[in-house]
Amino acid sequence: MASGGAFCLIANDGKADKIILAQDLLNSRISNIKNVNKSYGKPDPEPTLSQIEETHLVHFNAHFKPYVPVGFEYNKVRPHTGTPTLGNKLTFGIPQYGDFFHDMVGHHILGACHSSWQDAPIQGTSQMGAHGQLQTFPRNGYDWDNQTPLEGAVYTLVDPFGRPIVPGTKNAYRNLVYYCEYPGERLYENVRFDVNGNSLDEYSSDVTTLVRKFCIPGDKMTGYKHLVGQEVSVEGTSGPLLCNIHDLHKPHQSKPILTDENDTQRTCSHTNPKFLSQHFPENSHNIQTAGKQDITPITDATYLDIRRNVHYSCNGPQTPKYYQPPLALWIKLRFWFNENVNLAIPSVSIPFGERFITIKLASQKDLVNEFPGLFVRQSRFIAGRPSRRNIRFKPWFIPGVINEISLTNNELYINNLFVTPEIHNLFVKRVRFSLIRVHKTQVTHTNNNHHDEKLMSALKWPIEYMFIGLKPTWNISDQNPHQHRDWHKFGHVVNAIMQPTHHAEISFQDRDTALPDACSSISDISPITYPITLPIIKNISVTAHGINLIDKFPSKFCSSYIPFHYGGNAIKTPDDPGAMMITFALKPREEYQPSGHINVSRAREFYISWDTDYVGSITTADLVVSASAINFLLLQNGSAVLRYST
C-alpha cells in the first residue's frame, strides 16, 4: 500500500462561510483559553472539547451521562373479574410489583372456527340469502329469475373452486369463514384505566384505528399487522419473460422510425445502437452469444430484455377458508404511560390504590364472517351457434351457523420497572405533578343533506390536535356484505371489479353464416375486486365562539397536507383519504413539550362543520373525533387524580 501524502484542509473565508463556520471566533477562543490556562499555571493549556462546544459543534464528539440503574420485566396478569367470552368485559388488576409500570399489551387466542354443513338446493327453488337477496337455482331453459325463458341455459352447482356439487345432496357444502380486517383493533371496543374508582383515561376501537392510520410508521406496519391479526401479502415471481425494447418507433417495427405530420415514415436519428447494446446485450440477431463481450451492435436490431412478473397473494385470517385455525392477538394499550417511558407511573406512589384496566370485548358477529360456499353455474349454448357457449356464476349464499369461538390465554403483559432503593424512596416521599395527554372522543350521528354542524360538547381541556373522520353507517351495518372490510374506513367504499370474462375464439366458419361466430366466454367464480374509498367530506370548518379557525378548507388539505407537514416521523399521511387531522400544535406527537393548543374548556362554543354530497336521510353517517387533550396527573396520599375534571 502506498503511503499517503500530506492532507491539506482548505477553509473558504467568504462572507457566508464566516457566518456558518465562524473560524475567526474559533481561533480567538482557542487562543484566549490557552492564555487563561497558562496564567493559571496549568501544565496543559490546550482547551477541552467541551469548551470548544460552547460556541461550535464538534460532529465527531459523542456524549453520555451516567444513568440511574434500572431494570424491567414483563409480568403476566390474568383477568380480575369478568367471563372471558366475546361480548363481555374483562377487568385486569395492576399488582403492586416493581417501582413503575409502563408498557402494556393484551394477549388473547381466538379459537378455531368454521361454518355448519348445509344441504344443496334442488333445481327450481329459491331461498332468502344472507343479506336479504333472493337466491335462485333456476330450471334449465330459464333465465336467472326462473321465469323468463332463455334458450340453451343449463344450470349446475359448484363450490368456490369450480368443483361440482350434486343438487339435493344432504350436508353437501359449507360456507367459508374469515376474520374482519384488523381483528385485534376491533376486539377492544373500549379500554378504560381506573385508579381508586376514578377513570383517568379511556378510548374506543375508533381511536386505535386512527392511531394506526396516522402514527404507525411504515417500517413497523408488517409487525403491527402480525400482532393484530391482519394478513400480510407474500411476494411471488413468474419465470423469465422475453421483452422487446422499443426506442422511439412504432410497435412491431425492427427499424427505429418516426412518422411525421404527413404520415410519411422517416428514419429516427436519435437512436444510439451502441448505447442500447450496453444496457440490453440480448441481441435478437445473435441471441446465441447474448451476454458475451463479442456482440456487435447492429443499427437496426431489436434489442431484448429478460424480466419477471411480480405477484402478491395472501393466506391469512382475512382469506376465506373452510377452517380458520386459532388466531393469536397481541394488542398494545394506548394510554399516555404506555407510549412514553418518561411518563411511566410510579407504582410505589400508589401503595394501597386499586389500579384496573377494563376492556369491553367485541361480539363474535363483528369479528368473523362467512363467504359463500356454493355457486350456481349457468352454461348457455347460443341457438344456431353450437360452438359458442357463455358461462356465468352467481353465489348461493345462505348463512350457516359458525361455532362459538373460544377466548383463551387472556393475559395482560405489564412492563414493570425497577430502580435502586435510594430512587425508590424519592418517589415515595415526594408529591408528583406531571403533564399527561389523554384521549377525548366524540361520536355524533348525522343525516343532514349537504351541510351539517356539530357542537363538540364531549371535548374538554387543552386540545393539541384532532383526528377526524366521517364514517358511513353502512360501513358497520350487518346488511353490508363487506362490513368486515369497511368497518374502519372513513368514506364510502365502492368495488372496482376486474373484467371477469375470459374469451376464447376458434377460427372457423359456420355452415349457415358468412362470417365466423364461435366466441365463447367464461366468468370468474370470484372476480378480482379492488375497494376504492371515496371521501365524503368536501370541505371542513372549525369555529370557536364564532371565530373561524379553519374556514371551508378542502378535505384533502386535512387528510394529506397537514399530516405531511406536521409531526415529523411521529405522524404519517394516512392511506384512508377520509381520515383527517387538524392540529393546534406546531409539533404534534413529536416531543413531550407542548407546542400549541386550544383550551375548549374555556372555548365551549367549539363547532366542527362540513359540506358533503353523500350524507342524507338514508345514507347516514357518524362523525368521529379523537382529540389529544392535555391534563395534569397528581400523585399524592397514595392515589392518582387528574388536576382538571371539567
Curated annotation (Swiss-Prot):
Family: Belongs to the NCLDV major capsid protein family.
Predominant subcellular localization, coarse grouping: virion
SUPFAM superfamilies: Group II dsDNA viruses VP
GO MF term list: structural molecule activity
Ranges in a coiled coil: none
Record keywords: Capsid protein, Host cytoplasm, Host endoplasmic reticulum, Host membrane, Host-virus interaction, Late protein, Membrane, Viral attachment to host cell, Virion, Virus entry into host cell
Record function comment: Capsid protein that self-assembles to form the pseudo-hexameric capsomers of the icosahedral capsid. The capsid is constructed of 2760 pseudo-hexameric capsomers and 12 pentameric capsomers, with a T=277 symmetry, about 200 nm in diameter. The capsid encapsulates the DNA-containing nucleoid, the core shell and the inner membrane. Plays an essential role in virion assembly. Involved in virus attachment to the host cell.
GO cellular component terms attached to this protein's record: host cell cytosol; host cell endoplasmic reticulum membrane; membrane; viral capsid
Record's protein name: Major capsid protein
InterPro entries: MCP_C, MCP_C_sf, VP_dsDNA_II
Subcellular location field: Virion; Host endoplasmic reticulum membrane; Host cytoplasm, Host cytosol
A Pfam family: Capsid_NCLDV
Biological processes per GO annotation: symbiont entry into host cell; virion attachment to host cell
Topological relation to the membrane, as annotated: Peripheral membrane protein
Expression triggers: Expressed in the late phase of the viral replicative cycle.
Organism in which the protein naturally occurs: African swine fever virus (isolate Warthog/Namibia/Wart80/1980) (ASFV)
Subunit structure: Homotrimer. The membrane-bound form, but not the cytosolic one, assembles into large complexes. Interacts with the minor capsid proteins M1249L and p17; these interactions form a rigid zipper structure that stabilizes the capsomers.
Keyword Membrane: yes
